[in-house]
Amino acid sequence: MSFATVAEALRDFRRGKPLVVVDDPGRENEGDVVVAASKATPAVINFMAREARGLICVPMLGDRLDALKLNAMVEHGAPREAAFTVSVDAKKNVTTGISAHDRARTVAALIHPSTGPEDLSRP
């Protein structure tokens, strides 16, 4: 297996190409499919759900989480555990929240600067 250079990965990331980022063998020793949130189209979300089959997550800074009132799912986890928040769906232009379209819409809502807590539902 070959790995891309950082420059190649950044170029592809900017273009919206999904990448597999591999962590350290001393941690989980696994790869995560990542894509720029601004490029998370329904087709990309569908690919991630179909091929990677894991949770689709949106990493966010603490200030943004606070602004959206997204609390941690579990307080004070172990240092290497993922810090998940409560799950959310966008309120506008979604149906059940599970389709690729709905998930892409939720990602777009999470990163839009005018989105507030009132624009999200907790399923």
Where are these regions (language model features)?
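Catalytic domains of riboflavin
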Residues: M1-P123
